[in-house]
Swiss-Prot record:
Family label: Belongs to the peptidase C1 family.
Documented EC number(s): 3.4.22.-
This protein's UniProt keywords: Hydrolase, Protease, Thiol protease
Protein name in the entry: Cysteine proteinase
MF annotations from Gene Ontology: cysteine-type peptidase activity
InterPro entries: Papain-like_cys_pep_sf
Biased amino acid composition, Basic and acidic residues: 1-10
Keyword Amino-acid biosynthesis: no
GO biological process entries: proteolysis
Location of the region described as Disordered in the Swiss-Prot/TrEMBL record: 1-23
Length: 23
């Protein structure tokens, strides 16, 4: 689960970053 933890956080961070930058 730890291996996916950084992946999930990275994906969420990327989406949040794009959403803020896109908006």
């Amino acid at each position: 689960a730890d291996s996916l933890d950084w992946r999930e956080k990275g994906v969420v961070n990327s989406i949040k970053d794009q959403a803020q930058x896109g908006s």
